[in-house]
Amino acid sequence: RESPAMKFQRQHMDSGNSPGNNPNYCNQMMMRRKMTQGRCKPVNTFVHESLEDVKAVCSQKNVLCKNGRTNCYESNSTMHITDCRQTGSSKYPNCAYKTSQKEKHIIVACEGNPYVPVHFDNSV
């Protein structure tokens, strides 16, 4: 079974890669990373930084998660990310996404031992 840490990596990590100016990046990646099976995941963020740098966020600035839990952390520096948002007209099984590249601080929820990211909460 996929662990929460592995699920985070599958859904959110795309190290050393960037969409460049490929408008189909999200369509390809959401499918490749199995987020269009059974339904279209409406919103997802990919982080284009090393796994080490993203894991390190778990020891950075402690902030409140959207759901009120206290195990979220905000990155000290901005990171290169891509937001994928399902387009209004797309319907399962033909999931279609808009690709937006951003430089933002990421907020992740961490748990376990070792203490690692298990949920992407937000970007600011």
Curated annotation (Swiss-Prot):
Q: In which tissues is it expressed?
A: Pancreas.
For this UniProt record, give its keywords in alphabetical order, as a comma-separated list. Disulfide bond, Endonuclease, Glycoprotein, Hydrolase, Lyase, Nuclease, Secreted
Q: Quote the protein name from its UniProt record.
A: Ribonuclease pancreatic
Give the PROSITE patterns listed for this entry: RNASE_PANCREATIC
* Native source species: Balaenoptera acutorostrata
Bias (Polar residues) occurs at 14-23
Cysteine disulfide links: 26-84, 40-95, 58-110, 65-72
Q: What is its EC number?
A: 4.6.1.18
Question: Which residue stretches belong to region Disordered?
Answer: 1-23
Q: PANTHER family under this entry?
A: RIBONUCLEASE (PTHR11437), RIBONUCLEASE PANCREATIC (PTHR11437:SF24)
Q: What does this protein do?
A: Endonuclease that catalyzes the cleavage of RNA on the 3' side of pyrimidine nucleotides. Acts on single-stranded and double-stranded RNA.
Q: How does it assemble?
A: Monomer. Interacts with and forms tight 1:1 complexes with RNH1. Dimerization of two such complexes may occur. Interaction with RNH1 inhibits this protein.
